[in-house]
Amino acid sequence: MQLEVKINLILHATENEKKVFEELEINFQIEQSEFQVEEVSGHFYNPILLISSKLKRKTAQNFVSLFFSKMKKEEFEEIFNYVEDYVTSSGLSLRISKQKLMSGILALSREDTIKINISTPVYVKNETKKIYQELMRK
């Protein structure tokens, strides 16, 4: 199955870059070298880091397996049962709490998030739910 995972997050000057990369490696086995880091200036010229990664093939499959295995059962079931609500034109779009991940907890969130986009080709639109549910079970 063709699979791609995009991970995006924003780090502010007050956040510990080293700790964030450590937690990403511990929780998802993604090394710092697999991320691109771009430094930009914030509204008040404070440094902001835009961090992103694009995982493909085996690395993407490993991430997806780890990601869903670490998710709370209730949140997994919510996404699984209503997967169409989380699918955009670019794939399965999820946001997890950056702060909770620093404590080793994977939790969905709407604020201060790590954006996760999991995409795989869907050739027949009415199979979207089935394809993404199969992906979540692996």
Labelled PLM ranges:
Residues M1-E34:
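Long, hydrophobic N-terminal alpha-helical segment
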Residues V5-L9, L49-I51, T88-L92, I114-I118:
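Short glycine-/aliphatic-rich beta-strand segments at the starts of folded cytosolic domains
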Residues L9-A13, F28, L55-T59, K98-K100, ...:
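Beta-strand elements of well-folded, non-transmembrane domains
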Residues N16-K19, K58-L66, K125-K129:
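Short, conserved charged micro-motifs
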Residues F21-E23, V64-M71, Y132-Q133:
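Short amphipathic alpha-helices in soluble, non-transmembrane regions
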Residues F35-T59:
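Short, charge-patterned binding micro-sites
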Residues L66-Q99:
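Mid-chain, well-packed structural core segment of small domains
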Residues S93-K138:
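Glycine-rich, aromatic-bearing surface loops/beta-hairpins
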